[in-house]
Amino acid sequence: TELTLKKLTQSLITGVGLLALFGCAPSGQQSAEPAPTLSLERIYTDKEFNSERAPYFRWLDDGSGYTVLEARSKNTQQTDDDSHGVTGNDIVFYQPDGSGRKVLITVEQLTPEGADDALSIENYQWSEDGKWALIFTNGQKVWRHRTRGDYWVLNLESDSLYQLGGETPKETSLMFAKFSPDSQKVAYVQDNNIYVETLGSKNVTALTTDGSDTIINGNFDWVYEEEFSITDGFRWSPNSKAIAYWQLDQSGVEYFTMINNTDSLYP
């Protein structure tokens, strides 16, 4: 019994000694760095926890694949001081199984003559015959959506790129441009009138001329967009010989004055 107590005492002394030894270890080895605090700034300002979205893509009509926008630098030249070049997006084709990739439209093709930068693509579409691409850029909000801007067409056979709107296009003024089914023309709305432009020639024909603040041709006012999600107000006929469109006559709608009492603390 006495021998057992002696061994127990020695064990306790050894244990206390080890605890003291570890207790004297440097503080850096004692514990890991504290976990960062979850804050509103990290969630909403830094967007640290936002998930990545799938890139904007568009299926081809025949279902053979889809196209996406991919960022690339064009004509980059290295100098002693800096790197100079034009950035933009290629339009790239992918097969559904991922086995094939092909650049359909390059940054170079999307750079207007004399411009330093390529067009910033907000939307695009192909003509039915596959020979033209229609590019929407420089969009601005009309009500909720960016439906007014500039439209450019690219001839994929000749690489000719030009802005729609006739010989002297009015900047940021076109809406809802779309190819005719026969791929010969583009129709669009400008200043509440509908126009048709022949591809290549830039010849423009006005289909309506009575557009005004109260007569709206080919598009809709705020109520239709807000309540019914309707914005685009015209369609080509299948044979490309006619256009059906909506016309709104708001001449009987009176103005109603509203007081903005929320833009300052005191009236």
Protein language model regions, located:
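Beta-propeller folds
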Residues: S11-G15, C24-P267
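Bacterial N-terminal signal peptides that target proteins for export
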Residues: E2-I13
